[in-house]
Amino acid sequence: MVIEAIVTRLDAAFEQIEATPDSRESQQQRETILQWLDHASAEGYRLGLVTTLPAARFSALFEGQFGTASLDRFSVVVADAGQPSVDARQHPYDVALQALGVPRECAAAVASSERERREAEIYGMSRCVQIADVARAAAPLGHC
């Protein structure tokens, strides 16, 4: 099976960017995320993003740091992912994948930290990598 969609978790990067917006590390995070977004969009992947940030805070942070056009590349954004939902049995990745119309076997996860990558792996995403590795390699995620 071919990877059709990528669900992204970038909370660790967002925390760093919020805490030290002018630092070299935050600048590198922004550049890596933008490079990855450009690459994933050019490859034709459907993109979803899962974040624990509340929707208004996420929107202000993302648009302020990356621009509205970058946010528009995501087909779905699942905000408040750390809060218990009405249907607590539904994982935030389930919500994103359902909205993207892709089974987890045909989706990859890209994360900004090892903890986020492990979470996606435990959830059962077919491929789980850190954003810095994907951006450095600049290679398609390939097959499941």
Language-model features and meaning:
Residues 37-42, 97-98, 117-121:
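Surface-exposed amphipathic alpha-helices with a cationic face
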Residues 104-139:
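Acidic, Mg2+-coordinating phosphoryl-transfer loop and its flanking beta/alpha structural elements
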Residues 1-22:
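Asp-based phosphoryl-transfer active-site loop
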Residues 46-48, 76, 108, 129:
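A structural signal for isolated positions on well-ordered beta-strands in alpha/beta enzyme cores
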Residues 28, 32, 53-54, 88, ...:
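Short beta->alpha linker loops
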Residues 33-63:
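Substrate-recognition element of Asp-dependent hydrolases with the DxDx(T/V) motif
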